[in-house]
Amino acid sequence: MSQEITKEQIAAFDADFSAQRANRVAMNAVTNNGLLASAIRREAVEQDVHEYSISLEQGEICNQKQSGRCWMFAALNTLRYQVMKKYDLKTFELSQAYLFFWDKLEKSNYFLESILDTLDEPANGRLVSYLLMAPVNDGGQWDMLCNLIEKYGVVPKTAYPESKASSGSREMDMTLTEKLREDACILRKLHKEGKGLDELRTHKTRMLGEIYRLLCICLGEPPKTFTFEYRDKDNNFHREEGLTPKSFFEKYVGVDLSDYVSLINAPTEDKPYGRSYTVQYLGNVKEGSAVRYLNLPIEELKKAAIAQMKDGQPVWFGCDVGKHSERDSGIMDLDIRGLEDLLDTRFTMTKAERLDYGQSLMTHAMVFQGVNLDENGKPNRWRVENSWGKEPGKDGYYLMTDRWFDEYMYQVVVNKKYLTAEQIAAYEAEPIALEPWDPMGSLAVVR
């Protein structure tokens, strides 16, 4: 039997609030300054110093602006590092908008194929409702980025610059979403009328042609060939004509993407360590590789990330960026705010419980560009390259404490040479398929 809130209970709550002087002080501070600003702990800001024993050089900070392309920016920032080193460049940027174009087209096909795969599922059931929720969101995963590059290559930003729709994707995404939901409705109606799969796929091809046209209008036509011109650090001018996106990747980037694997830390009962996982209905390029993770203890993620940076290579990662972080200072620290003291309450959930109860998930991808190791070789803070421009943090860089890493870091991508033979075998084993709405797939459904 349910129980309502009574007047007597409210009177008791009010008396308890009024009896504590600290409640009045907290109320005045929060109502005038806001909850999070009132809780900033000065000592945490003073202790978190942006200096690191291992610090990699990097180009100018990028800015994803009003879009959910963090995963793409982070991945391309790790790849541009190779170009800058190889060709002695002060800075360089690969076109995020170019891969954004193809990602939207591929996601549209992936969505429509998923609709064809679920024609007999109820439209208001959990699965189809989930698919319809965000057909072409901006988010993604490392493996999805690799699929795009292997199929379409990459281009420098000068060959395909940003557009209004790539820097602020909301209007385009809303239009694409409406069109794809309409397409899903049409395909399901045709199925109910008894039309066969071949006829439905004919309709799907027409639908994709319309999506392609919309993308060209919003983002511009992607280049088939282009000229690459640049100056090195010594101001020497270079030009190469007739490049294609794939030949540019092969010559100027030259990274074997198959060497890299995703490690996650998901300490929940349903995901034993030492096993590989995938997420159902998560992807973009239909014929590409499935998203795959190896679940390991958090110390293994740290060990692999540090080893890769010691070899001079940055590390792509996924985390829950909004928890215990302060945008202006760029500090990610469990002690950055004293909310428990301010509110006289306690937050006691473990990392596993936060995942199980919807309190935390992967929300943002960035790049590790350094780490500070203490006298025992243990990390105590990590240097983070963000993609929110130069204003937040220290010239666009964030600082992550090692304790924050423990609680809100979920994924790193590293070269498999930093794994043991046993770990590689576990990664390559048949993955366990997680539900589409599992928190380990959340980075790819950023909306």
Predicted regions and their residues:
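N-terminal regions that are enriched for targeting/export leaders
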Residues: S2-G59
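Active-site nucleophile-adjacent alpha helix/oxyanion-hole segment immediately C-terminal to the catalytic cysteine
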Residues: Q47-V315, P392-D395, D402, Y410
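Catalytic nucleophile-His microenvironment captured as a short glycine-rich beta-strand/loop
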Residues: C70, I149, D356-G389
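Short His-Asn-centered micro-motif
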Residues: F73, F317-D320, Q369
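Long, positively charged binding patches that form subdomain-scale interaction surfaces
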Residues: G288-T363
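Generic recognition of flexible, low-complexity loop/linker segments
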Residues: V291, L301-A307, E353-G358, V367-D374, ...
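Active/binding-pocket-proximal capping segment
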Residues: V321-E326, I331-M349, N372-E375, W382-P392, ...
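Conserved catalytic-core surface of thiol
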Residues: D374-R447
